[in-house]
Amino acid sequence: MAASSSGEKEKERLGGGLGVAGGNSTRERLLSALEDLEVLSRELIEMLAISRNQKLLQAGEENQVLELLIHRDGEFQELMKLALNQGKIHHEMQVLEKEVEKRDSDIQQLQKQLKEAEQILATAVYQAKEKLKSIEKARKGAISSEEIIKYAHRISASNAVCAPLTWVPGDPRRPYPTDLEMRSGLLGQMNNPSTNGVNGHLPGDALAAGRLPDVLAPQYPWQSNDMSMNMLPPNHSSDFLLEPPGHNKENEDDVEIMSTDSSSSSSESD
């Protein structure tokens, strides 16, 4: 009778334990199932020992304890499967956490690189905008090449490019002949009709014809017409534009030298 009463108490405890174990973690449920299996196994062994010694135990009570033990063992096996699945899931979670940490590190590195690239691109865009502004400003204030050439000619004609070593501010000397020096020189005297006959550097026929040889003709288009017309007499015609009979090699060399000087003086005076 004591064994039957203990078996009934065990049934009540197991029933209450199953109701409470439903809201616990898997680990607690496994521990509870192990304790129940241990208690049921001990109870079954005691019942078998008593029935063997005294032969007073009823067969129904032994079967009930055995059924409870089998049922509890089935629950324990289910919990073991659940624990294994949860262990696999936990392992996968750990792997995923490591992967997430790695990806997070990669994202931070990429974010750093993107910030650097953004800064570089912002600088490049700013510089490009400034260049576009400069280009637009240059287009609006464009200057023709002729104006630049004229301005360069004025600078070269009115400013020195290489001053003497003893030159000081206010010194009138220049590293090139001034307009006054050019007019008082040999070339300036050649252009003066009153002194052409005295110098004798040009052939007599050319002077008599009232013209300069072709090599002495001005090299600038804006001077050629005016100077040629000034050198021609009123009754001059195009029939006299042939080379003079007295033209020779010596006079040609002198004329070439003087023509070079004439070109330089014309550019400076303009």
From Swiss-Prot:
Residues 259-270 have a biased composition (Low complexity). It comes from the Eukaryota. Disulfide bonds: none annotated. GO terms for cellular component: core mediator complex; mediator complex; membrane; nucleoplasm; nucleus. Residues 1-22, 226-270 are annotated as: Disordered. Its main location: nucleus. GO terms for molecular function: nuclear thyroid hormone receptor binding; nuclear vitamin D receptor binding; transcription coactivator activity; transcription coregulator activity. Keywords: Acetylation, Activator, Coiled coil, Nucleus, Phosphoprotein, Transcription, Transcription regulation. GO terms for biological process: positive regulation of DNA-templated transcription; positive regulation of transcription elongation by RNA polymerase II; positive regulation of transcription initiation by RNA polymerase II; regulation of transcription by RNA polymerase II; RNA polymerase II preinitiation complex assembly; transcription by RNA polymerase II. The modification N-acetylalanine is found at residue 2. Residues 24-48, 90-131 form a coiled coil. It is found in: Nucleus. InterPro entries: Mediator_Med4. The modification Phosphoserine is found at residue 32. Component of the Mediator complex, which is composed of MED1, MED4, MED6, MED7, MED8, MED9, MED10, MED11, MED12, MED13, MED13L, MED14, MED15, MED16, MED17, MED18, MED19, MED20, MED21, MED22, MED23, MED24, MED25, MED26, MED27, MED29, MED30, MED31, CCNC, CDK8 and CDC2L6/CDK11. The MED12, MED13, CCNC and CDK8 subunits form a distinct module termed the CDK8 module. Mediator containing the CDK8 module is less active than Mediator lacking this module in supporting transcriptional activation. Component of the Mediator complex, a coactivator involved in the regulated transcription of nearly all RNA polymerase II-dependent genes. Mediator functions as a bridge to convey information from gene-specific regulatory proteins to the basal RNA polymerase II transcription machinery. Mediator is recruited to promoters by direct interactions with regulatory proteins and serves as a scaffold for the assembly of a functional preinitiation complex with RNA polymerase II and the general transcription factors. PANTHER family: MEDIATOR OF RNA POLYMERASE II TRANSCRIPTION SUBUNIT 4. Belongs to the Mediator complex subunit 4 family. This is Mediator of RNA polymerase II transcription subunit 4. The lineage of its organism: Eukaryota, Metazoa, Chordata, Craniata, Vertebrata. The gene is MED4.
